[in-house]
């Protein structure tokens, strides 16, 4: 197991859930924090602050460990928009280009999706975009570069039989082109592998 994978598994154990939904995630076998000797019943109950903090950290980690400043700014934009702040926040996060590539199952992980973007393997409406935080909009097309179509992890991700693509996205396996059809209609439509507790995240930044 590589150091990077070990690091990711430690994140899941520290946050008490499989942040990225990996079947082999260490949290599935060791449901206690790194450094803790076994599942001790003497561990104190988390405070309200720690619950809110963990919810925020889980969400940040799920989207590839977004830097705090960038994540906070995203929340500020969500709060200024009309409507429900929690749904606005999720909508903004789901519009990130790296998140869209990940949701389309073009890449096996959010980190691999981000690399595809940063290495200029992704086109939006025919234009190469190498900014992971770039926000796509309804109707945008997401296309792989010719070189990316030959990358083993991309081929492997697309050829998986158990691929699940959210209804607000679409992907043409033959043309290697995806579409951001619309915004998620609700938080429950987003395929989080854990309870995202978005309201706790909103409360954390609103305190």
UniProtKB/Swiss-Prot annotation:
UniProt xrefs under PROSITE patterns: RIBOSOMAL_S4, S4
Residue ranges with Polar residues bias: 28-39
GO biological process: ribosomal small subunit biogenesis; translation
S4 RNA-binding domain location: 95-158
UniProt KW rRNA-binding keyword: yes
MF annotations from Gene Ontology: rRNA binding; structural constituent of ribosome
Protein name in UniProt: Small ribosomal subunit protein uS4
Gene that this polypeptide is encoded by: rpsD
